UniProtKB/Swiss-Prot annotation:
Alphabetized InterPro entries for the sequence: Aldolase_TIM (IPR013785), TAL/FSA (IPR001585), Transaldolase_1 (IPR004730), Transaldolase_AS (IPR018225)
GO BP: carbohydrate metabolic process; pentose-phosphate shunt
Subcellular location as annotated: Cytoplasm
HAMAP family to which the protein is assigned, alphabetical: Transaldolase_1
Keyword NAD recorded: no
PROSITE patterns, A to Z: TRANSALDOLASE_1, TRANSALDOLASE_2
Protein name: Transaldolase
Active site positions: 132 (schiff-base intermediate with substrate)
Matches recorded under Gene3D superfamilies: Aldolase class I
Length: 317
């Protein structure tokens, strides 16, 4: 019998949304994605102790300044975890820029170059790395610069059509439109508390973005992210990529239910519209209260987890 996971792999690149190396070995995804929250949870696992020690030693050798040591240790730990994952996945690892830089184009570019340099020094070429950046206007501009330097980017915390359009117009390699967090917002802020998968507002958002990209011939990869249940995943079967947490990969592997393709644009390709200006971007994005709330909340949450990671690392410096 074909499992749903195998069926999904036949139409969509399956990516593991985890920093847990054992889970990645088990489900054999093409790529893996990490973020500050996943790095924080992974760093608590005993098998990662040596990676933390290596990051601490690296930071101490680079600088005597405590603040700089903390920054260097964080960056090195994220890359160390990425390097371990790259021993298992045949494709790419996504490593995230510090969320506290989300509104600073120059600082985001500088941090991305540093992360790439650490990977390159470990013998990993750019074509196996995606730099994750929050989909703010400033982050999108940073990604535009990085893409021209041959550094491919994964634009995350993407909730609005305006964000998706601006990313495509900037020539970004890949976007991660969120599904589950959109559902969370609608459940919390409207009277409707239950959704069937094809009416799930997160599913509708990603479907709309996917069709828009195909309709206008944008090459940017659409990788649905942040899932709350397998119904959301099966409704997006056929999406370019889906990044899925281990618990949901397990559910897909244990199911033999039929999995028809849902996303498959067959229409004509139209001429691309003129790119959004900064003011148009903000107008359109800010007209979506869900997107405004979830982008800001996502940046705050990642920043808080970075600070927790720093607190742990600082005890070792």
């Amino acid at each position: 019998m074909t499992t749903q996971l195998d069926a999904l792999r036949n139409m969509t690149v399956v990516v593991a949304d985890t920093g847990d190396i054992e889970a990645i070995k088990k489900y054999q995804p093409q790529d893996a994605t990490t973020n500050p929250s996943l790095i924080l949870s992974a760093s608590a696992l005993p098998q990662y102790a040596s990676l933390i020690d290596d990051a601490i030693n690296y930071a101490k050798a680079k600088s005597t300044d405590k603040a700089q040591q903390l920054i260097d240790a964080e960056d090195k730990l994220a890359v160390n975890i990425g390097l371990e994952i790259l021993k298992i996945v045949p494709g790419r690892i996504s490593t995230e820029v510090d969320a506290r830089l989300s509104y600073d184009t120059a600082a985001t570019v500088e941090k991305a170059r540093k992360l790439i340099k650490l990977y390159n020094e470990a013998g990993i070429n750019n074509d196996r790395i995606l730099i994750k950046v929050a989909s703010t206007w400033q982050g999108i501009r940073a990604a535009e610069i990085l893409e021209k330097e041959g550094i491919n980017c994964n634009l995350t915390l993407l909730f609005s059509q305006a964000q998706a359009r601006a990313c495509a117009e900037a020539g970004v390699y890949l976007i991660s439109p969120f599904v589950g967090r959109i559902l969370d917002w609608y459940k919390a802020n409207t009277d409707k508390k239950e959704y069937v998968p094809n009416e799930d507002p997160g599913v509708i958002s990603v479907t709309s973005i996917y069709n828009y990209y195909k309709q206008y011939g944008y090459q940017t990869v659409v990788m649905g992210a942040s899932f709350r249940n397998i119904g959301e995943i099966t409704e997006l079967a056929g999406c370019d990529r889906l990044t899925i947490a281990p618990a949901l990969l397990k559910e897909l592997q244990e199911s033999n239910a039929d999995l028809p393709r849902k996303l498959d644009y067959k229409g004509e390709v139209k001429p691309k519209p003129a790119p959004l200006t900064e003011s148009q971007f903000y107008w359109e994005h800010n007209n979506d209260p869900m997107a405004v709330d979830k982008l800001a909340e996502g940046i705050r949450k990642f920043a808080a987890d970075i600070e927790k990671l720093e607190a742990m690392l600082s005890t070792k410096l």
